[in-house]
Amino acid sequence: MNADRIAASYRWLEYAAFGLALEKARFDSLSRAAEARRVLILGEGDGRFLARLLEYNQNASVTVIESSARMIQLAERRVPACERSRVEFHQMDAVAGAFPDGPFDLAVTHFFLDILNPRDAEAVILKVNARLAPGACWLVSEFQEPTGALRLLHARLWLSAMYGFFSITTGLRASKLPPYRDLLERAGLAEIEHRERRFGLIRSQVWRKNCSGSDMSAAAFIPIDKPVK
């Protein structure tokens, strides 16, 4: 997959299709990043989440892995000059590339796992998990196939349209969602928080490594009412 072709227009394509729903999902659990010192982001895209993270947490160092050179350029423009020393960009394929060493105390994948086939999704999840500190959180925003006949039909229609569009415009090879939640659980992570939008099509989640049953508190959601510039 190569997102260079649609990088400049991606934000507007997103807004046209979903309004602010994806943007809100990215920021739902931003409060979980408050104490993070090392953050790993896969598939950041045009930098909207990165910019908000740097503003919200002014001490964290951030490592970004992104395959699209054009997306990295857009993301770099969103990083203020005074904050550039805190961000390290790596243009690489997350499946085949070698990740920086951990430990990280926060991982972030927003609408990234859905572009991977099951085998590649499992490989990426294991690579990230191996670099997470015990107790670290992983923020995941993704599409899903929800329960309920009407909700499921709605989701499948949207997913079919999206996979078809990205197959044509980016060369995406995946054609359906990988079982990412099962893969995260199999890797030893536990979902401790979630929120759904768009009839269950969109799910923002917080997963924790080595989560104990006594630590299931939910952080307050961070509302967003306008697009990120």
Sequence positions of predicted segments:
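A short acidic, Gly/Pro-enriched loop at the edge of an enzyme's catalytic core
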Residues: G97-A107
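A short SAM/SAH-binding and catalytic strip from SAM-dependent methyltransferases
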Residues: L106-R119
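A short glycine-rich, Lys/Arg-flanked "PGG" loop and its adjoining helix->strand segment in the class I
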Residues: E122-P134
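Conserved alpha-helix/loop element of class I SAM-dependent methyltransferases that forms part
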Residues: G19-A36
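Class I SAM-dependent methyltransferase Rossmann-like catalytic core
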Residues: M1-A21
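Class I SAM-dependent methyltransferase SAM/SAH-binding core
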Residues: L40-I41, G45-A96
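C-terminal alpha-helical "lid/dimerization" subdomain adjacent to the S-adenosyl-L-methionine
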Residues: S141-A187, H194-R195
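Core SAM-dependent methyltransferase catalytic element
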Residues: A187-A190, R195-K229
